[in-house]
Amino acid sequence: MIYKTYKANTYNIYTIKTDKFKTCHMEIVFRNNIDKNDITLRSVLTEMIVENTKKYNTRRKMMIELENLYNAYFYGVTNRVGSSVITSFCFDFIDPSLVKENALDFIKFPLEAVLNPNVKNNEFDLITLEYVKERVKKDIESIIEDPKNYSISKLLEKMCPDTESSININGYTKDLDKITPETLYNFYINMIKHDYIDVYIIGNLDMDKISNIIKNNFKVNILKNHNITYNINNKIIKKHKKLYESFSTSQENICIGLNITNETKFEKNYVANIYNMILEEYIHDVNVQILLERYAHFEIIGISILQLQFPKENK
């Protein structure tokens, strides 16, 4: 594998050249500090960009073009890391050399999708927006169908209210009705201008050529006038809190959470990760599961350390 980094005005292009795979993977990554007030906008915008574009202004046209690119796959993912939010637009495509195609045809697709969404007169397409909002609403509401994730989200809301830890990365249904084609476009422009952006690509490609294609077709001027922090200052809980919630489900869940404070940088980066591995091995041990099911009538479905609080390093 050959690793290279290319400077492109206000963003970087990170490449890994390898012939181990017959497909290539590309990501356009947006990073910023998470904000509860606009997390729903970000969730909707991510879905809008991968739904259609100005050039391919319907889902059908979008899918036909992806099929023409040998069944390429374009999708968006938003995650929270500490107190930051990361939105990635991902593109999986076949190694162009295997089908004797110009790499430009593949690389331009995700770049154009991000820079030229389905916008007219500074407004996103209303029909697409209403469809996407309904889909996002279902995604938000469907968490109750997953007892494990639902209980964890409720645990964080109870433990860490009014902090980044408790923010639902999918957004909030009460905010969906406030989103209009115009407000979504304004948020899009703000994200393009103020999010930190990087491009990642891996595959058997001429990376010098690919980096030039990206530079020529992805021209953004990012105003980096703020720092992105991953630290979350969760308040110390002096008394333990309990939350009971009952609803119809075939599986009951008990979540126990606690804030780990005064970690050193070494403990956070290494000890916690190793301890996570030990816990994961424990819950997947067949003998442990048999004993729990036979004598305790329950099973452990997950134990992990969620690094939600990042205090300053203790010297």
What are these regions (language model features)?
Residues 134-150, 285, 289:
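Short acidic/His-enriched helical or mixed secondary-structure segments at domain edges of catalytic enzymes
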Residues 14-16, 22-42, 59-112, 149-174, ...:
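M16 family metallopeptidases and their MPP-like homologs
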Residues 48-51, 69, 112-117, 135, ...:
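Structured segments of extracytoplasmic/periplasmic soluble domains
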Residues 61-64, 116-141, 226-235:
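Acidic/histidine-enriched alpha-helical segments
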Residues 1-69, 172, 185-286:
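His/Glu-rich zincin catalytic helix
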Residues 108-120, 217-224:
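A common structural junction motif
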Residues 52-55, 96-100, 116-126:
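Short, polar/flexible loop-turn hinges at active-site or ligand-entry regions and domain interfaces
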